[in-house]
Amino acid sequence: METKNLAIDALRLPLIILVVFIHMNPTFDSVGYWGLTINTIAQVAVPCFFVIAGYFFVGNKPLTLEMYKVKLKKRVVTLLIPYLLWNLVPSLVLIGGNLFSIVFRGKSTEDLMTFLTDLWNDGVWHLWWDKVNGMPSDSPLWVLRDLIVMCVLAPVFYYFIKKGGKLAVVILLLLYVFLPVSWAHLPGISVIAVFFFNIGLYLRYNGIDLIGGSRMYQLACVTTAFVLLILAVLFRNQEYLYSLFILVGAFCSFVLIGWARPSVVKCFAKFSPTIFFVYAIHQTFVLSYTGQIVGRLLPDSYIGAVLHYLIVPFIATAVCMGIYYLMNLVSPKFLKVLCGGR
């Protein structure tokens, strides 16, 4: 069991790199099938995080009221407090940048006052819910927002899984594949969160390991994921192919990390404490500035665009980790609060 948990910790590293790839927002015109293929693969990252969260929410014992209360109290520290703090960061960065320009460059205060006025008039609470296109202020943390909601609703889901069994999974699968887009991305209860969190609950409730399975299952999973990836890329307007690839691709991720050498697993797992920090900070300013700097060093061509797309996520992830380790030296207690005690 410890080996499998270590593998799950190790999986978080490639998953977070894939998340950074997602936020590169590639276009087909700029990077062609390279970008489209990698971006499609990257979409499995968030579902994997939800599966892991659902799997470990239940534990080995039935979900009782007392256990539920204990778990919610822990989630206040591990999820809610970091969520509230991190969603202040983009606004603080913007305010800080404006103040710097006002003091050192003589810039007018108009932009800063407009931002603060709009923030107040729109409702400050939107920072933590739907500030940016249905996402919170620190946009990648929509995942954390939805995960908090999933944890609150866990007893409902647990009862649904317990009584519905495989039928419950089939119902959720149909909703996941065929639910209209306008319903699929409701803030707090996105279909991705509901489906994959419940998959994690179902697997744990039925004693099915995330890592492992028969050799036939593993080969079938990897083969099916590969075929669906090709189809999803070639027929990129067919949403159901895209959804099916993400589903099978998520399970394929657990298979592939199970195939990794023990030395690779141990190496990847060492970075597990940094993953939440990278997730929270990369979109606030690191990815943008890294992209600008690397972009100046590459030729303005198709090759340059592809190299930019392939290189920047790794550099941005490394920079985020560097900030994490620096903060761990300077202010480990504050860092621990920001990372939910991780």
Regions found by a protein language model. Name each.
Residues 1-173, 297-342:
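Membrane-cytosol interface segments of multi-pass membrane proteins
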Residues 1-43, 181-197, 201-226:
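Transmembrane alpha-helical insertion/packing segments
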Residues 20, 203, 268-271, 278, ...:
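A generic structural signal for nonpolar/aromatic side chains embedded in well-ordered alpha-helices
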